[in-house]
């Protein structure tokens, strides 16, 4: 796979198709992608105010009436009051149907700005500029938008494909190491469900896999985005196949909710991946070596592979509200082999308990 620092484009073949442009120093591409717009709103997280202002000024120099809208960081920005605030500001500045939004930030910014774009005037264009690894390989690609409520994570949302996605790898240099590592959980997920070469690259040199200066991480980003683009093209609205992108997320979302979103999404998904692998192994669907490989790869990256031993009853309660459930029946994405995702519906409580026991952290109780 091409890994030079020249821009690489991955096409997401939905209707209409759109590009995910991967490279460095890509902000200059934004003007051309947006085209002729009267007004543009740049939705950004606080730490990116300076970059957002650079974008705003650049657009203003082109004659665009450009505005910055700051939203809270991380999961604090993914709720109805924040969306209501965005609607209010979009109305005040007069964003019309021919205008556009730009999201600048991590996955939470992509989710909430995308939801605002999907619902404002029943849909306006948006370009995503993800600045975290998680945003690049997951949230910004595929058109899923959403917010959190007391009922659960991402249960309120809409499908709204972006006009384009700009993945500027240079922004990874600004991430705290633990934020970069957390994003690797989604990369590992892509490897297990569809592209084992991702796993080989990480195992060969885990340290290089999280080095934003190297070519290994650049290739991992490209490969993970390509996996998601292929799945989204085959099943845009998550009628069936796209569910495989939720591998590890059933327990992961429950952990996030139990932790009141203080855990990073990737950290929770990492534990969820180990749990899903144990479920499949104990159900006789996944070989021991591949199940064990989950734990070794995630651990090598510095991601968590265990959780509070006493938490299962509460986690089961939260998982019951998972969007993959059907008629109250709990469903998991599992593996029937490497890069062979399947489903496990209505697992016996004893199986759930045994799988959880395999990752329970007695010290966290």
UniProtKB/Swiss-Prot annotation:
It is found in: Cytoplasm. Zn(2+) binds at residues 186, 249, 265. Keywords: Amino-acid biosynthesis, Aromatic amino acid biosynthesis, Cobalt, Cytoplasm, Lyase, Metal-binding, NAD, Nucleotide-binding, Zinc. SUPFAM superfamilies: Dehydroquinate synthase-like. Pfam families: DHQ_synthase, DHQS_C. GO terms for cellular component: cytoplasm. Binds 1 divalent metal cation per subunit. Can use either Co(2+) or Zn(2+). NAD(+) binds at residues 73-78, 107-111, 131-132, 144, 153, 171-174. Its EC number is 4.2.3.4. GO terms for molecular function: 3-dehydroquinate synthase activity; metal ion binding; nucleotide binding. Its main location: cytoplasm. Pathway: Metabolic intermediate biosynthesis; chorismate biosynthesis; chorismate from D-erythrose 4-phosphate and phosphoenolpyruvate: step 2/7. Its cofactor is Co(2+); Zn(2+); NAD(+). Catalyzes the conversion of 3-deoxy-D-arabino-heptulosonate 7-phosphate (DAHP) to dehydroquinate (DHQ). Belongs to the sugar phosphate cyclases superfamily. Dehydroquinate synthase family. PANTHER family: 3-DEHYDROQUINATE SYNTHASE, 3-DEHYDROQUINATE SYNTHASE, CHLOROPLASTIC. This is 3-dehydroquinate synthase. It comes from Mycolicibacterium paratuberculosis (strain ATCC BAA-968 / K-10) (Mycobacterium paratuberculosis). The gene is aroB.
């Amino acid at each position: 796979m091409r890994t030079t620092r020249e821009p690489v484009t991955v096409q997401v073949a939905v209707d209409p198709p759109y590009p995910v442009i991967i490279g460095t120093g890509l902000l200059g591409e934004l003007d051309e992608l947006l085209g002729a717009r009267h007004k543009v709103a740049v939705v950004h997280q606080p730490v990116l105010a300076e970059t957002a202002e650079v974008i705003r000024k650049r657009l203003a120099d082109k004659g665009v009436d450009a505005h910055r809208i700051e939203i809270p960081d991380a999961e604090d920005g993914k709720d109805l009051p924040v969306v209501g605030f965005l609607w209010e500001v979009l109305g005040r500045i007069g964003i019309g149907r021919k205008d556009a939004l730009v999201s600048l930030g991590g996955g939470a910014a992509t989710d909430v700005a995308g939801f605002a774009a999907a619902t404002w005037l029943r849909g306006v264009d948006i370009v995503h500029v993800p600045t975290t690894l998680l945003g690049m390989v997951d949230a910004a690609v595929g058109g899923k938008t959403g917010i959190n409520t007391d009922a659960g994570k991402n249960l309120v949302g809409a499908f709204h494909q972006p006009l384009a996605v700009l993945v500027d790898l240079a922004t990874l240099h600004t991430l705290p190491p633990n934020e970069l590592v957390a994003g690797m959980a989604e990369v590992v997920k892509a490897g297990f469900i569809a592209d084992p070469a991702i796993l080989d690259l990480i195992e060969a040199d885990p340290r290089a896999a999280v080095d934003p200066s190297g070519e290994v991480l650049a290739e991992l980003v490209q490969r993970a985005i390509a996996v998601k683009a292929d799945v989204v093209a085959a099943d845009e609205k998550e009628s069936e196949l796209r569910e495989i992108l939720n591998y590890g997320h059933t327990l992961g979302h429950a952990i996030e909710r139990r932790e009141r979103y203080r855990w990073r999404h990737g950290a929770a998904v990492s534990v969820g991946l180990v749990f899903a692998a144990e479920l499949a192994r104990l159900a006789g669907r996944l070989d021991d070596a591949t199940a064990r490989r989950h734990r070794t790869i995630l651990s090598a990256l510095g991601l968590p592979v265990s959780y509070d031993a006493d938490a299962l009853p509460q986690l089961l309660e939260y998982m019951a509200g998972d969007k993959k459930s059907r008629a109250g029946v709990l469903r998991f994405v599992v593996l029937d082999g490497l890069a062979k995702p399947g489903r496990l519906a209505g697992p016996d409580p004893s199986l759930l308990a045994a799988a959880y026991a395999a990752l329970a952290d007695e010290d966290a109780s």
